[in-house]
Amino acid sequence: MLIAVERLLLKIGQPRSRADELIALRRRLRDERARKIDDDERALAREVLARKLAVSAELDAVSSCRSCATGAPWPRGAYDGGDCCAGVTADLFDENELAALVHAGTRVRDLAPPPGADEHAGCAFRGPRGCTLEVAHRPGRCVHYLCDTLRRELHARGQLDLVEAKLADLNRTMQQFTQVHQAGLDRDVLAPIIDAILTR
């Protein structure tokens, strides 16, 4: 009942395209949260979170991202900043990224969209004042993308090497998480088949 009300409120309060993306994402989040996972997967999800926050802390003072989309065609240019945020929500929150978020603590209540009056231009969480998600609840790829403009700014600040090293750590950890997560999904699929064979 509560999920039906939640969907109705999204459809009433948001542009249809954003509401559809949010409903699908929240459904996938609930499905992933219902999975039984092992301690290794949960520990790696928390490590992905820690490494993502470490990268984000280095990017906190950058100014490039506030105006990078100015003058770009729609949907990229709908807002001044966040050119790299103009992707499709389901692509940004792919299966592995969403699983890492869920098992590090992200819940449906953490996925708050911009006000409904704000145009849906790319990711469902992109609005005129930036992303509505706290960094902890954004996919790792949201801090992983370094465009040429941002790279130049980081180089001028003397931060580029440090940020690239932290991104490499994040990437390695996400690859480890993905391997463990995919192995868990394989077990989920194979377990009933193996049980059926063994009980014959």
Where are these regions (language model features)?
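Hydrophobic scaffolds flanking metal-cofactor catalytic centers in soluble metalloenzymes
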Residues: 1-200
